[in-house]
């Protein structure tokens, strides 16, 4: 291909109609100028850098789903002889093929899920995507088209929705075909490895050339599947730019499986050729998936980011105006006020309530502060009232009052005398017992008030710890919120690798997806739809690989990894019975703790 930047988004047209197209135009121009300085017309140097980066990322990536090979099959780390060295190199090539193809399948599946979610939305949601979620250039273009069509005809909204549906449908169609081709490739390779595993260990001198020939044929089939995409591309495609050149893989020389053994040089050349074809496949998929992938996060949420940038700029200007750089002390005053408010909140709602609770729990009643009303004061008032009632009754009745007479009995005598005195209030106020009766009632009222205050003081003292806890509630709720956020962050509950409830749900849904694909595979086999069954089996391997990655860490934490790993391998065996596979899926979600629901639901 000609030297050009690996652009994943829109490519500018030659007729520049607005300022938004100038940026990609000049960036493309500068890239071409830089590429022209290289010693060759083809981007070999850039390709080597890209391949080196891809290999580095591949090394960092965790080991993918195991290959269907015998346990004694030598890996790249166990080289004991020339024969085992060639076999180990083949093992490394197979692992790299599986890892790269499954990684590309994952990228395709993520984009496909995005387009399906948008396509299933309402017309308003589709229109919003076309205008606001494809970048500022698309925002200007689609807004202009929408306004012009609204002024000229009444079906502007309908036209926008149809354009959105066409935009999404075309991308989904290409991604589905790419996914089907890669899934078939994975399925065929997996089945061949399952068939030839024993031969690769026992007679590698014959099995290795045969396997390389099979891989060569699989690449040829993949080339034919991808060439179909170029043939059926629509002339009015909404995908910007042109497709890359049709993918052409290098061919191995004709192999005579019953002939003489291959030399080490021929095996090395064949392995290098497989590596080269894999690099071509990755380069082709990076361009094709890049043209049909979901918008990048920056493009998808550019409106939010723009509003955030504008708001941040306004806030920065406002902050600068109130800073010491402009001679203002507002920020220092605000910081001081915030510090004082924080300290006050901590003192009122944390420190003092805790101290009060401590004092209430560990101090004795004798160390308490003096209350509003003491029992001794009430007793003095009660004794004074008793003496006043006794003297009044003895003078009024001219009889000695018994020692066991209650205040209530004497008060009845006072009230009877008081009622008689009220017949002539003026005369009796000056010369009668009316004044003494009033004073006795005042004393009785004073006693009642002091008694009520004493009871209230006792209630307050008894509930002092409750009031202290009530004052500490704001700080308590704030601590609960902070601990919840910290727990979610530590558990990474939003990912399938986490330990929380959401992570467990994601892992169980992966098991459900695996079970559905097992049943779909069996249904296609019974209907004689071998091609569709092959594609579904490849997607089954992809789902198993995803579950294999996300369940490894939690399964190791519960010491269940060896058993879980063996069950996942059994689910991927092509010759295994469907009924047994369904039994294994039930065992996964009912036996292993790493795949069980949350403890609360149990």
Swiss-Prot record:
Deletion phenotype: No effect on plant growth, AOX levels, mitochondrial protein content, and lipid composition.
Subcellular location as annotated: Mitochondrion outer membrane
Effect of residue 457 to N: In dgs1; partially restores digalactoglycerolipid content in the dgd1 mutant
Major location category of this protein: mitochondrion
Residues spanning the membrane: 300-320, 465-485
InterPro entries recorded: NCA2 (IPR013946)
Record's GO cellular component terms: mitochondrial outer membrane; mitochondrion; protein-containing complex
PANTHER family on file: NUCLEAR CONTROL OF ATPASE PROTEIN 2
Subunit structure: Component of a mitochondrial large protein complex that contains, at least, MIC60, DGS1, TOM40 (e.g. TOM40-1), TOM20 proteins (e.g. TOM20-2), and petC/RISP.
The protein's role, per its UniProt record: Involved in galactoglycerolipid biosynthesis. Contributes to an intracellular signal that regulates an alternative DGD1-independent galactoglycerolipid biosynthesis pathway in chloroplasts. Being involved in mitochondrial lipid homeostasis, modulates mitochondrion biogenesis and physiology, as well as stress responses.
Protein name in UniProt: Protein DGS1, mitochondrial
Organism in which the protein naturally occurs: Arabidopsis thaliana (Mouse-ear cress)
Gene: DGS1
């Amino acid at each position: 291909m000609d030297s050009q930047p690996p652009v994943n988004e829109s490519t500018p047209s030659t007729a520049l109609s607005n300022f938004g197209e100038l940026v990609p135009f000049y960036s493309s121009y500068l890239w071409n100028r830089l590429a022209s300085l290289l010693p060759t017309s083809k981007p070999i140097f850039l390709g080597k850098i890209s391949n080196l980066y891809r290999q580095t990322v591949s090394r960092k990536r965790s080991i993918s789903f195991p290959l269907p090979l015998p346990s004694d099959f030598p890996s790249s780390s166990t080289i004991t002889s020339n024969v085992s060295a060639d076999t180990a190199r083949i093992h490394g090539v197979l692992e790299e093929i599986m890892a790269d193809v499954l990684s590309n399948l994952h990228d395709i599946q993520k984009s496909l899920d995005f387009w399906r979610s948008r396509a299933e939305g309402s017309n308003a949601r589709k229109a919003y995507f076309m205008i606001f979620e494809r970048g500022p250039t698309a925002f200007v273009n689609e807004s202009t088209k929408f306004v012009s069509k609204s002024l000229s005809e009444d079906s502007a909204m309908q036209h926008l929705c149809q354009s959105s549906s066409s935009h999404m449908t075309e991308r989904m169609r290409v991604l589905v075909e790419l996914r089907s081709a890669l899934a078939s490739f994975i399925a065929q390779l997996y089945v061949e490895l399952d068939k030839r595993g024993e031969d690769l260990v026992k007679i590698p001198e014959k099995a290795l050339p045969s396997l390389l020939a099979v891989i060569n044929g699989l690449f040829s089939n993949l080339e034919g599947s991808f060439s179909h995409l170029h043939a059926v591309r629509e002339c009015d495609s909404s995908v910007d730019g042109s497709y890359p050149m049709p993918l052409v893989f290098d061919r191995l020389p004709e192999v005579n499986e019953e002939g003489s053994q291959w030399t080490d040089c021929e095996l090395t050349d064949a392995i290098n050729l497989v590596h080269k074809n894999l690099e071509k496949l990755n380069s082709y998929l990076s361009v094709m998936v890049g043209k049909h992938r979901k918008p990048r996060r920056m493009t998808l949420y550019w409106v939010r980011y723009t509003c955030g940038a504008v708001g941040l700029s306004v806030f920065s200007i406002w902050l600068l105006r109130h800073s010491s750089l402009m001679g203002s002390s507002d920020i220092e005053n605000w910081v001081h006020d915030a510090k004082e408010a924080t300290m006050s909140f901590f003192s009122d709602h944390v420190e003092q309530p805790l101290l009060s609770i401590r004092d209430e729990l560990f101090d004795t009643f004798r160390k308490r502060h003096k209350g509003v009303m003491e029992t001794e004061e009430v007793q003095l008032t009660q004794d004074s009232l008793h003496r006043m009632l006794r003297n009044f009754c003895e003078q009024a009745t001219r009889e000695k009052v018994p020692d066991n007479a209650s205040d209530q009995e004497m008060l009845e005598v006072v009230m009877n005398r008081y009622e008689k005195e009220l017949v002539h209030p003026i005369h009796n106020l000056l010369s009668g017992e009316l004044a003494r009766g009033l004073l006795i009632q005042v004393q009785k009222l004073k006693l009642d008030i002091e008694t009520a205050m004493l009871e209230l003081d006792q209630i307050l003292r008894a509930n002092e710890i409750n009031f202290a806890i009530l004052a500490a509630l704001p700080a308590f709720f704030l601590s609960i919120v902070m601990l919840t956020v910290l727990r979610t962050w530590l558990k990474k509950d939003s990912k399938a690798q986490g330990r929380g409830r959401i992570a467990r749900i994601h892992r169980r849904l992966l098991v459900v997806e695996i079970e559905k694909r097992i049943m779909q595979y069996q249904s296609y086999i019974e209907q004689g739809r071998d091609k569709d069954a092959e594609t579904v089996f490849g997607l089954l391997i992809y789902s198993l690989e995803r579950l294999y990655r996300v369940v490894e860490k939690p399964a190791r934490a519960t010491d269940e990894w060896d058993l879980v790993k063996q069950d996942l391998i059994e689910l991927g065996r092509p010759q295994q019975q469907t009924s047994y596979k369904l039994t294994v899926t039930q065992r996964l979600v009912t036996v292993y703790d790493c795949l069980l629901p949350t403890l609360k639901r149990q």
